[in-house]
């Protein structure tokens, strides 16, 4: 699946960082989320727009 399938511009994904840690994010295509491994948070992508609010992020459990 191409990154454009989720409606997010790949160039924008390169610029985004975790608002909590300022760390790198990786795209989880299966769940349509941007994942911060350092913060253990997954930020949702809704209608092609990354929701970069900690309050909206899902905690990643082990």
Curated annotation (Swiss-Prot):
One of its GO terms (cellular component) is cytosol. Transmembrane segments: none annotated. PANTHER family: PROTEIN PREY, MITOCHONDRIAL, ZGC:162634. Belongs to the UPF0434 family. This is UPF0434 protein Avi_4243. It comes from Allorhizobium ampelinum (strain ATCC BAA-846 / DSM 112012 / S4) (Agrobacterium vitis (strain S4)).
């Amino acid at each position: 699946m191409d990154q454009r399938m989720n409606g997010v511009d790949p160039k924008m994904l390169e610029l985004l960082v975790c608002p909590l840690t300022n760390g790198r994010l990786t795209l989880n295509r299966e769940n349509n989320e941007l994942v911060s491994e350092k913060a253990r948070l997954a930020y949702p992508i809704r209608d092609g727009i990354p929701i970069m609010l900690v309050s909206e992020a899902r905690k990643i459990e082990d």
